[in-house]
């Protein structure tokens, strides 16, 4: 039986290219049968494969003396085996309250942070965990019942990037029963976590009431679920590539904390790519630390939000992420503090940097720019009173418009241009020393501006609006 177990794991490791020879492996060991079976399997292969083994154990301090005894058990075991052992006690309940998350998510974050630290300390290539085939079945069932993303429905990955190496699960090809039999043959007496039997947890109920029926239908059901998982992961990788490619054409603006997209262009994508496109945006903005409260329901909400007939509105997501729609554009970004009114003099020539990182640059020239687009303002030097002043908008602001009699409200210009309300407060209003509004960058020039057609040889004051926005590409 022992040889059969080892051979099955060998085949699985080889088939999925799980780990390479001459590697340092950090093994997560709780003291339970799964992690002990993994440790003993790797120790059996250590000499032939030239593995360096480091054991890592986390006491989450959920079970008082009992969990502390687990830690001591792992330390004593490693001492007897002559294996390096790194342990830590973490008050996960305190961490949970501090960051407002559920116990399982808090424990996972603390545990993975410790594993990453140990991986770095020993320059390890792999972190190995003891998830097995039954875990895979339970995970996929649980996500189907609760709802998840397409990536989530694929279940547990055999191998995925982690820190500067990989997180691997060599036992996904074997069942819990095979693991227990392997431990019995080696006369290993593992620690048992009583919480694994509590029926308050969905996973435990699936394990007790659903999994046995599936195994009655097919004793090798875990292999079918593993095959399903691999196919889902392969399909998902392809669709992710397509979504990434498409989204880089949909995105109109991108900064570290904000992404804007064109709704009509986004809606031209197929629904599978739309869902994945939203997920890519969330991954980028949350820096892959997606809040546990975020689910596929939120992605569906965004897609429904785009289909509404109202031209504007907003959604609030976990972690202070706000999604704001303004006509045919939608912006995803983190809530910012209220923009304070601003006033700043701009020398000629000179440069100022605006709060959003964009710049206004002035120059004096006898020639006008060849490209007189919305980012350029040109006036006769002597028609303007100096200094130039850059300020935030004020109630009642009006300006004379180039080629039009009378004046127009700045508010009306913003509305016509479909500028979102939150952007209006930080939009620069360019005035002269007499208080005349001479330019609303990117939107309207005043009657002080000259056109390319009417320009003659003269001395001109020129203002350029230079955006710091990077290209609309998102990170994978």
From Swiss-Prot:
Domain of life: Bacteria
GO cellular component annotations of the record: cytoplasm
Record localization: Cytoplasm
Binding residues annotated for ATP, in chain numbering: 30-35
Molecular functions (GO terms): ATP binding; tRNA(Ile)-lysidine synthase activity
Recorded catalytic activity of this chain's protein: cytidine(34) in tRNA(Ile2) + L-lysine + ATP = lysidine(34) in tRNA(Ile2) + AMP + diphosphate + H(+)
Pfam families according to UniProt: ATP_bind_3, TilS, TilS_C
InterPro entries: Lysidine-tRNA-synth_C, Rossmann-like_a/b/a_fold, TilS/TtcA_N, tRNA_Ile_lys_synt, tRNA_Ile_lys_synt_N, tRNA_Ile_lys_synt_subst-bd
Keyword terms of this UniProt record: ATP-binding, Cytoplasm, Ligase, Nucleotide-binding, tRNA processing
SUPFAM superfamilies: Adenine nucleotide alpha hydrolases-like, MesJ substrate recognition domain-like, PheT/TilS domain
Function (record text): Ligates lysine onto the cytidine present at position 34 of the AUA codon-specific tRNA(Ile) that contains the anticodon CAU, in an ATP-dependent manner. Cytidine is converted to lysidine, thus changing the amino acid specificity of the tRNA from methionine to isoleucine.
HAMAP family in alphabetical order: tRNA_Ile_lys_synt (MF_01161)
Note on domains (UniProt): The N-terminal region contains the highly conserved SGGXDS motif, predicted to be a P-loop motif involved in ATP binding.
The family this protein is said to belong to: Belongs to the tRNA(Ile)-lysidine synthase family.
Name the record gives this protein: tRNA(Ile)-lysidine synthase
Native species: Bacillus anthracis
């Amino acid at each position: 039986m022992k040889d059969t177990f080892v051979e099955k794991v060998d085949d699985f490791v080889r088939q999925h290219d799980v780990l390479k020879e001459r590697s340092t492996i950090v093994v997560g060991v709780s003291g339970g049968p799964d992690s002990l079976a993994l440790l003993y399997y790797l120790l059996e292969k250590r000499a032939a494969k030239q593995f360096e083994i480091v054991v890592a154990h986390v006491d989450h301090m959920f079970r008082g003396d009992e969990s502390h005894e687990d830690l001591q058990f792992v330390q004593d075991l490693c001492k007897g085996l002559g294996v390096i052992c790194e342990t830590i006690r973490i008050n996960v309940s305190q961490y949970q309250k501090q960051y407002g998350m559920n116990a399982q998510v808090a424990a996972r974050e603390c545990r993975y942070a410790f594993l990453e630290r140990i991986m770095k300390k020993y320059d390890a290539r792999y972190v190995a965990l003891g998830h097995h085939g039954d875990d895979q079945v339970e995970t996929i069932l649980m996500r189907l019942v609760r709802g998840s993303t397409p990536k989530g429905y694929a279940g547990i990955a055999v191998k995925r990037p982690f820190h500067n190496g990989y997180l691997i699960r060599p036992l996904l090809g074997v069942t819990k029963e095979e693991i227990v039999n392997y431990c019995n043959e080696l006369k290993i007496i593992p620690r048992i976590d009583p919480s694994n039997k509590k029926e308050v947890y969905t996973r435990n109920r699936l394990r007790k009431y659903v999994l046995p029926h599936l195994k009655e239908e097919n004793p090798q059901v875990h292999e079918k679920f593993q095959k399903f998982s691999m196919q889902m992961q392969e399909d998902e990788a392809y669709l992710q590539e397509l979504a990434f490619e498409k989204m880089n054409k949909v995105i109109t603006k991108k900064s570290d904390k904000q992404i804007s997209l064109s709704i009509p262009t986004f809606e031209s994508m197929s629904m599978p790519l739309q869902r994945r496109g939203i997920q890519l945006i969330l991954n980028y903005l949350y820096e892959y630390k997606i809040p546990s409260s975020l689910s596929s329901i939120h992605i569906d909400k965004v897609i429904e939000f785009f289909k509404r007939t109202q031209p504007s509105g907003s959604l609030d997501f976990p972690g202070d992420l706000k999604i704001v729609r303004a006509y045919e554009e939608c912006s995803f970004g983190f809530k910012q503090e209220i923009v304070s009114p601003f006033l700043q003099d701009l020398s000629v020539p000179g440069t100022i940097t605006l709060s959003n990182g964009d710049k206004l640059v002035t120059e004096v020239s006898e020639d006008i720019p060849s490209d007189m687009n919305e980012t350029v303002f040109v006036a006769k030097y002597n028609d303007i009173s100096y200094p130039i002043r850059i300020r935030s908008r004020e109630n009642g602001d009006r300006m004379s418009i180039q080629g039009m009699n009378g004046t127009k409200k700045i508010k009306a210009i913003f509305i016509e241009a479909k500028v979102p309300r939150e952007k209006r407060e930080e939009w620069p209003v360019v005035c002269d020393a007499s208080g005349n509004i001479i330019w609303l960058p990117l939107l309207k020039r005043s009657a002080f501006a000259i056109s390319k057609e009417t320009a003659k040889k003269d001395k001109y004051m020129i203002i350029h609006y230079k955006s710091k926005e990077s290209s609309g590409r998102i990170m994978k």
